[in-house]
Structure formats: C-alpha cells, structure tokens
C-alpha cells in the first residue's frame, strides 16, 4: 500500500512484515483484549449488585440473608392436565 511520509511517497512492500512495531502492536492488542474481557465480566457483576438497591439501605451486607428462589426446572410440564394421548395403533375396538 502506498503512503506519504515527510513529503515522500513510500511503498509498504519495502518494509519487512516482521518489523518490531508490528510485533509490539500485536502484543498490546492482545493485552488490551484480555483487560477488556475481564472488565466486562466484572461490570456485569456490579450491575447485578446495583439492581438490588443501595448497599447502605440493604440489611444483608455481609452475604447472609434470605435464600433466593429455587432454580427453575427444565423439561416437561407435568402439572397441567391436557387431553390424554391417543391409543397405540391397533384394532378398531372389536
């Protein structure tokens, strides 16, 4: 790719693909990715805590408190009664 530096037109093919600036830029890119990844994990935790109200208003600051709701069960819903399933294939009731 052609670019201008100090009033001169230069071609990037003349530079080595493994120059030091490329390696350092790659390192800092990975470092910033790791930092932002962990920041997003921590910020979601802070948002959850804020949704329950101010910590000064809470009676349960030390982690104790009433238990939460039990986890929802996944699978079939057995408490609703619907029509019974059709009989197995077979005769006509003779």
UniProtKB/Swiss-Prot annotation:
Subcellular location, record wording: Endoplasmic reticulum membrane; Cell membrane
Regions that span the bilayer: 20-42
Cellular component, GO annotation: endoplasmic reticulum; endoplasmic reticulum membrane; Golgi apparatus; plasma membrane
Main location: endoplasmic reticulum
InterPro entries named in the record: Se_SelK/SelG
GO-annotated molecular function: identical protein binding
Expression sites by tissue: Highly expressed in heart.
Membrane topology category: Single-pass membrane protein
PTM field: Cleaved by CAPN2/m-calpain in resting macrophages but not in activated macrophages. Macrophage activation up-regulates expression of the calpain inhibitor CAST/calpastatin, resulting in inhibition of CAPN2 activity. Truncated SELENOK proteins produced by failed UGA/Sec decoding are ubiquitinated by the CRL2(KLHDC2) complex, which recognizes the diglycine (Gly-Gly) at the C-terminus of truncated SELENOK proteins.
Signal peptide limits: none
Keyword Transmembrane on entry: yes
Gene Ontology biological-process annotations: calcium ion transport; endoplasmic reticulum calcium ion homeostasis; establishment of localization in cell; intrinsic apoptotic signaling pathway in response to endoplasmic reticulum stress; macrophage derived foam cell differentiation; neutrophil migration; positive regulation of defense response to virus by host; positive regulation of interleukin-6 production
Ligase among keywords: no
Region of interest (Disordered), ranges: 48-94
Site (Cleavage): 81-82
Subunit structure: Interacts with DERL1, DERL2, DERL3 and SELENOS. The SELENOK-SELENOS complex interacts with VCP. Interacts with ZDHHC6.
Role of this protein: Required for Ca(2+) flux in immune cells and plays a role in T-cell proliferation and in T-cell and neutrophil migration. Involved in endoplasmic reticulum-associated degradation (ERAD) of soluble glycosylated proteins. Required for palmitoylation and cell surface expression of CD36 and involved in macrophage uptake of low-density lipoprotein and in foam cell formation. Together with ZDHHC6, required for palmitoylation of ITPR1 in immune cells, leading to regulate ITPR1 stability and function. Plays a role in protection of cells from ER stress-induced apoptosis.
Record protein name field: Selenoprotein K
Organism in which the protein naturally occurs: Homo sapiens (Human)
Gene: SELENOK
